[in-house]
Amino acid sequence: MRVIAGSFRSRKLIAPRGSGTRPTSDRLRETLFNILAPRIAGCRFADLYAGTGAVGIEAISRGAEHVWFAERAEPALAAMRANLTALKIMQGFTVEERGTGALLERLAKLAMKSSEAAEPVRARELIDLVYLDPPWEAEAEYEKTMGLLGSARGRSILVPGAMVVAEHSSKVPLPERFGELVQTRTLKQGDAALSFYALAVE
């Protein structure tokens, strides 16, 4: 496993041993970032169910302004931190060790506090791109996370024009809509698929 492009191009990344973590393949990651390329530089990126952090690190390598990693499995967290340390990435990221739900709730609370204040939500609290890759068999995780992102509460942490991408089994299609999130395309590659969502136009 390696970084595909950018400032850390070709640098190796580690993954925990065993079958507990299923990192996004280099090929699928390359396909993903070929599509996202025009949006990456300067963006705020959320890598949910981040595992080894390979997707978020790829975003940093390609110029993302800030990446939020959400992961709670200790073996994956250890690999993620080792990868960040090996690449000497010391800033421009936040790791939420309590998992995806905790990160989204934390950002939603910050957005709510900011909306009640005299000043608007600070740009760094808003997300341009979200990538989520739960265990493929965990349908409840997709429903919970996509449902939250598609709700009014979730919408408060997404910039207008934000994109949400979910990796899942190519044999199990995701719903075309989660609240205000509407599926725009699905790309299949072997056993994996990427489904892209955008906020519905008001």
Label each PLM-derived region with a short phrase.
Residues 1-202:
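Class I S-adenosyl-L-methionine-dependent methyltransferase catalytic core
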